[in-house]
């Protein structure tokens, strides 16, 4: 099978935006992005240019997020706006669904929306035992138990235990998790989301994300009300907004080869 590949490191300044296209028979493409962010304000223009020039049908097969510092993910809300579909998003795994919740807090706290845009969010645990029969991109077997109050309609969430996947025997992608240091902050993210759901009078995450502009008390000692959207943004900023080494949750990184 004939194949042609094209890769590009986009000029975003401080941050990272890397894209790739693998072209094969009958003009079919496999498109992927590794990180999409910058400290520069022009990231949205660059994302626009990428979608217009590289995604003919506005479908992205794979988005890989290395970590959650803002200069690596600031362009994702814009990317979600411009594409029709992102089939799979891979994020680093660290002790449960906390990084999944942190990802949602960032997206919805920054005017993003994943409704009907994403098929699957996969947390990658490359330190797990390798399953040789579970490597095909289109048929990955992932599993994780998510409480009903954290699930979202039509979006599958799973954990991939392994270090490599392949796409139609054309290309092999290898993942590697790096851990800077262990923290106990991850469990607090889940706790804060639970409290926000409760304080907003909602029954679960699905309902909460439909009330982004509704007011919620900032805390029990504060009479000032802020919106659900701003509360989610504050949760993200509390745990992972810094790109200078002092973020609390950004102690793991997902490398892609």
Language-model segments: residues:
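Active-site metal-binding motif and surrounding structural segment of the metallo-beta-lactamase
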Residues: 30, 43-91
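Generic alpha-helical propensity signal that fires on short helical segments
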Residues: 25, 50-52, 78, 102-109
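Active-site environment of divalent metal-dependent phosphoester hydrolases
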Residues: 14, 40, 68-73, 95-98
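Generic hydrophobic/packing signal
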Residues: 10-17, 36, 78, 83, ...
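Flexible, acidic/histidine-containing loops and adjacent segments that form or flank the divalent-metal
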Residues: 2-5, 82-257
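Conserved beta-strand hairpin/beta-sheet module of binuclear metal-dependent hydrolase folds
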Residues: 2-53, 58, 256-257
């Amino acid at each position: 099978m004939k194949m042609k590949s094209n890769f590009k490191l986009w000029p975003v300044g401080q941050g990272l935006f890397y894209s790739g296209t693998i072209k094969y028979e009958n003009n079919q493409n496999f498109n992927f992005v590794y990180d999409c962010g910058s400290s520069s304000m022009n990231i949205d223009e660059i994302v626009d240019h990428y979608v217009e020039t590289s995604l003919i049908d506005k479908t992205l097969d794979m988005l890989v997020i290395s970590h959650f510092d803002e200069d690596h993910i600031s362009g994702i809300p814009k990317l979600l706006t411009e594409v029709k579909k992102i089939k799979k998003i891979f994020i680093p795994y660290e002790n449960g669904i906390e990084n999944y919740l942190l990802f949602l807090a960032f997206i919805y706290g920054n005017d993003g929306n994943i409704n009907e845009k994403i098929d699957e969010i996969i947390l990658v645990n490359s330190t797990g035992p390798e399953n040789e029969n579970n490597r095909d991109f289109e048929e990955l077997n992932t599993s994780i138990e998510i409480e009903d109050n954290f699930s979202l309609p039509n979006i599958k969430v799973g954990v991939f235990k392994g270090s490599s996947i392949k796409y139609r025997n054309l290309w092999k992608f290898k993942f590697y998790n790096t851990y800077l240091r262990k923290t106990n902050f991850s469990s607090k993210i889940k706790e804060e989301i639970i409290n926000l759901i409760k304080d907003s009078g909602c029954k679960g995450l699905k309902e909460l994300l439909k009330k982004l502009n509704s007011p919620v008390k900032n805390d029990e000692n504060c009479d000032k009300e802020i919106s659900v959207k701003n509360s989610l943004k504050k949760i993200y900023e509390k745990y992972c907004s810094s790109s200078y080494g002092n973020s609390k949750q950004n102690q793991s990184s997902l490398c892609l080869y």
